[in-house]
Amino acid sequence: MKLLQKKEILLISLMLFSMFFGAGNLIFPPFLGYEAGEHVWISLVGFIISATGLPILGVISIAKAGSFQTLAGRVHSSFAIIFPCIVYVFIGPGLGIPRAGSLAFEMGPGQLFPEAGSGVLLFYTVIFFSIVYWLSLSPSKLMGLFGKVLTPLLLCMIALIFIKSMFTTVGDMKEPIGNYGQAPMFQGFLDGYLTMDALAALIFGIVIANALRAKGIEDDKGLAKYMSIAGIGAGLLLSIIYVILGYVGAISGSLGTFDNGAKVLAQVMTTLFGQGGVVLLGLIFTIACLCVSIGLVTSCSQFFSSAFPKVSYKVWAFIVSVVSMILANLGLTQILKVSVPILGFIYPIALTLIILGLFHKYIGKYAYVYAVTVWIVAIFSAIDILNKNVMMNQWTSVLKYIPFYTEGVGWIVPAIVGMCLGFIVSIALNKNK
């Protein structure tokens, strides 16, 4: 097995970090810090466990399985195509990429020119997605682009904010708000869970695997080893950045009342750097959104070109980029109304697959564990989404009796029940053969 140099491992880790670290990762921790106030540190522990731990486990699970399709194929052969396609569409051009382009505009030119109309947005997104498409055309060069250029630049800017905040009186940590007062660690865990970064772990695996193959790592054992190391490295770096951003949010308590992390960051940046802070924040968002968009376009195009080989990688990259650009300009609000419920439906299924994949060594011989567990979680998830988006919470009076349902993780008990049933069915059918 070929061994990578430490520098190459670092570059792979930085590459994965930059693909994970998008606008949402910039916004969530400051708002957590703002709401947690004096309880920021214990809240961040919970946040990091889920926001960093789940993606790391996702990368490791994919590394063990070999690919997303292989992991999904343990449920059923048709599931190996259908489920990854749904995930790639909705976390890519269906939501993630157009939202990144839109947020890059809102936090950049949109902050400097609040009266800018749709024409300016169109001009900006044409340039933004042209750059994304151009840089996505050479997947083999992404490790150098992310590891040597974009990620160090992004980290330097975030470090500048942290250093400046340490030597500037910004504000005081206030009393925690809501559940951050009673159960700060658990609330932090729930907020980290809602970042849904574990979904990204499933689809970025193909990019990391191909980057490793370009470095001569061809065997399954080597790919699994270095993908896992990259996942842990990216997770550690994410944790450090979350602590910095959480602290920045915590000291903003006396600066005003805010309803989201973007407003917290904007106010802190203005306090620290004046009008120049708005420009710096715009650059940070632009680079973060650019990295995520490139990663998503690349991973989606690599997947679709392998699943549907009659259309080349470059054509898929063009299609994904153009569709994302159009959606960023034409009704992102409407897209969110459709995409967010679908993501809410597939997220518990994806997490169930990740957990099962981690223990495949022990459960793989039981033929029905994957299928029964995933289908029970899928049924519960569908009922939950219908309740929230169609039935206007009419079923909540019944569903609330499921443990952890009101906290947003009610799928855990159905998953455990499904796993137990899967074992029973597997053993029973095996005995009857």
Kindly label every feature range from the protein language model.
Residues 93-97, 155-180, 198-199, 247-250, ...:
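Hydrophobic alpha-helical segments and their helix-loop junctions in multi-pass secondary transporters
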Residues 53, 57, 153-165, 227-252, ...:
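Selective recognition of specific alpha-helical transmembrane segments in multi-pass small-molecule
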Residues 62-71, 129-150, 214-217, 326-338, ...:
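Membrane-water interface regions at transmembrane-helix termini and the short interhelical loops
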Residues 69-73, 241-290, 297, 341:
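TM-loop-TM module centered on a large, flexible mid-protein loop between adjacent transmembrane helices
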Residues 31, 78-114, 289-306:
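Hydrophobic transmembrane alpha-helices that form the core helical bundles
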Residues 135-165, 339-351, 370-378:
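Membrane-interface loop-to-helix entry segments
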Residues 354-420, 428-433:
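C-terminal membrane-solvent junction of multi-pass transporters and transport-like membrane proteins
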Residues 11-21, 162-171, 180-245, 280-289, ...:
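Hydrophobic, membrane-embedded alpha-helices of multi-pass small-molecule transporters
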